[in-house]
């Protein structure tokens, strides 16, 4: 199959298996959920009655005071006591094998092509690290919510995009299922497309 280059009167021949496969919604959902779960910090923690600071002494005698019986100031019933079912740090990551991950990326890229959300250009750069230059370039292309993927990190482009809302710049190694889905359009250079093909082959 061929992808038309937006900034040149030519087309780029690409693999049908990478950019023309059926959309596997279940697989994409599983991989996206796993990716998001892996990004969780998972460091929350609370203290049980065994861990909170305080004496182990019985606050007052069992009988004769008229007060409710009590055995510890660290009881979960008390203010400043421990938590009954205290949260523990945990690893939320889910296993996704390479074949599934690559399959999900291929499904997403193919769907982007079908929905005309993938824009392929010969090259994409700015002369200087100026936000104004990139903002004007995107305005000329009628783009405002866009992920720009280049074959290698372009420092000028990266610095120019940092202060633009809903604009992100990645190299091929930095793309992931969530970022491909999150943006309205994906602009990819011809070299980046070839690299993606090799990576997912």
From Swiss-Prot:
**Record organism:** Edwardsiella ictaluri (strain 93-146)
Keyword entries, A-Z: Ribonucleoprotein, Ribosomal protein, RNA-binding, rRNA-binding
- Say if the entry is tagged with keyword rRNA-binding: yes
Member of which family?
Answer: Belongs to the universal ribosomal protein uL4 family.
Q: Name one GO biological process term.
A: translation
Q: A single GO molecular function, which one? A: structural constituent of ribosome
Entries under InterPro entries matching the protein: Ribosomal_uL4, Ribosomal_uL4-like, Ribosomal_uL4_dom_sf
* UniProt name for this protein: Large ribosomal subunit protein uL4
Which cellular component terms (GO) are annotated to the entry? ribonucleoprotein complex; ribosome
Q: What does this protein do?
A: One of the primary rRNA binding proteins, this protein initially binds near the 5'-end of the 23S rRNA. It is important during the early stages of 50S assembly. It makes multiple contacts with different domains of the 23S rRNA in the assembled 50S subunit and ribosome.
Q: Provide the residue span(s) of the region labelled Disordered.
A: 44-71
How this chain assembles, per its entry, is: Part of the 50S ribosomal subunit.
Q: List the disulfide bonds.
A: none
